[in-house]
Amino acid sequence: MPFTVNTSDEFGSWFSPLEEALQDDILFVVRLLQEHGPQLRRPYADTLEGTSLSNLKELRVQHRGEPYRILFAFDPKREALLLIGGNKGGDKRWYKRMIPSAEAIFERHLETLEKGEGNGKTP
């Protein structure tokens, strides 16, 4: 049974203007996440350090030699939420900048779930 993968508004805003070839590469890895769920490992997914969320992970996408990362987490419903993405190539502070944003997006998502409202969108 495939896992549900939803997207945050922030992820959608980042993803929508990307060129089609990059979107295709990202969607390939998202489909692997749908198939394997939390068991997806390197080279396509990895755990993160420096986060207060034990289940915050990254999808790893290589596109034309550039390293793209999508931060995601599984919520209590065991559905993945793609939080935020970007090209980390040459940016040593990428994780320091993006992890706090991803944590805030996920916390907001959890609050929404507690209220009984769903805000995830399936790619």
Where are these regions (language model features)?
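Basic, Lys/Arg-enriched alpha-helical interface segments
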Residues: 1-67, 76-80, 87-123
